Design a protein with these regions (language model features):
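Negatively charged
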Residues: 2-154
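Generic beta-strand hydrophobic packing signal
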Residues: 127, 162, 187-190
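Cys/His-enriched low-complexity segments
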Residues: 134-135, 166-168, 180
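Serine/threonine-rich, repeat-prone extracellular segments and beta-strand-based repeat modules
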Residues: 147-150, 164, 196
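Short, solvent-exposed loop/edge segments of extracellular or virion-exposed proteins
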Residues: 155-169
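Short, surface-exposed alpha-helix to beta-strand junction/turn motifs within ectodomains of secreted
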Residues: 174-199
C-alpha cells in the first residue's frame, strides 16, 4: 500500500472497513494527501514494518490512531513530517522495533507544529542519542521526549483485598484496593471475573 494515496490532494473518503491485517508497507501512503482526515483507528497495522513518510504533508489529518499496534514498525522516518494538524496521543505506541539501522525515528515529528503529547514512555533502547530532527518544529519539549537508550518499565498494578481467609459467601461484601506504580491518565478500567465457584 506504499504511496497509494500519494499526491491525492482531494481524497477524503472513508477507509474504515479496509482489511489491513496483512499489509507490511504503508510508507508514503497519505503523503501530500492534504484533505484526508478520516477515521482509521480500527486498522490492524500489526504487521506493518514500513511507515516512513506515511502522513507527510497530510495537513488536515488529525484522526485518533492511538490504539494502533505498531510493534512491528521498523522505519517511522519523517512519518508526520509537516502534518500540521496532527495532535493525537500516541504516547503508548510500541516503537521498540525501530533502530537507526532501519531508518528508525529520524524526523518523525519534524514540522508537526500542533503535536504536543508526551512520548517519554516510548521504548527507545536501540538509540544511543536522539535521531536527527526527531521533534524539530513540534511542541515536544525535553520533558515530553523519550529517554534515548532506555526502555522504561511499564506501570504495575497491585491489588489487595480485605478477605484474609479467602472465603467469600454469597451476598458478602469484599473490599478491594488497587495501587498503580505511577499516575494514570484518565480513568483506568479494571475487570474482575470469578471462576471455580461451587453452587
Amino acid at each position: 500500500m506504499d504511496g497509494i494515496f500519494k499526491n491525492s490532494t482531494s481524497f477524503n473518503q472513508s477507509l474504515t472497513n479496509w482489511d489491513t491485517s496483512n499489509v507490511t508497507d504503508m510508507s508514503e501512503m497519505f503523503k501530500n494527501a492534504t484533505a484526508f482526515n478520516q477515521n482509521i483507528s480500527n486498522w490492524d497495522v500489526s504487521k506493518v514494518t514500513e511507515m516512513h513518510y506515511m502522513f507527510q504533508n497530510a495537513s488536515a489529518f488529525n484522526a485518533d490512531i492511538s490504539l494502533w499496534n505498531t510493534s512491528s514498525a521498523q522505519n517511522m522516518t519523517y512519518m508526520f513530517l509537516n502534518a500540521t494538524s496532527f495532535n493525537q496521543n500516541i504516547g503508548d505506541w510500541d516503537v521498540s522495533s525501530t533502530a537507526p539501522s532501519t531508518g528508525g525515528l529520524e524526523g518523525m515529528f519534524s514540522g508537526a507544529s500542533s503535536y504536543s503529547y508526551s512520548v517519554k514512555k516510548w521504548c527507545v533502547s536501540n538509540f544511543s542519542s536522539a535521531p536527527a530532527d526527531f521533534s524539530t518544529g513540534s511542541q515536544l519539549n525535553n520533558s515530553k521526549l523519550p529517554q534515548w537508550g532506555v526502555c522504561p518499565s511499564r506501570a504495575t498494578l497491585i491489588i489487595t483485598t480485605s478477605d484474609v481467609d479467602n472465603v467469600i459467601y454469597s451476598g458478602s461484601d469484599l473490599s478491594i484496593t488497587a495501587n498503580f506504580s505511577e499516575a494514570m491518565q484518565g480513568t483506568p478500567s479494571i475487570k474482575i471475573t470469578t471462576g471455580g465457584l461451587n453452587a
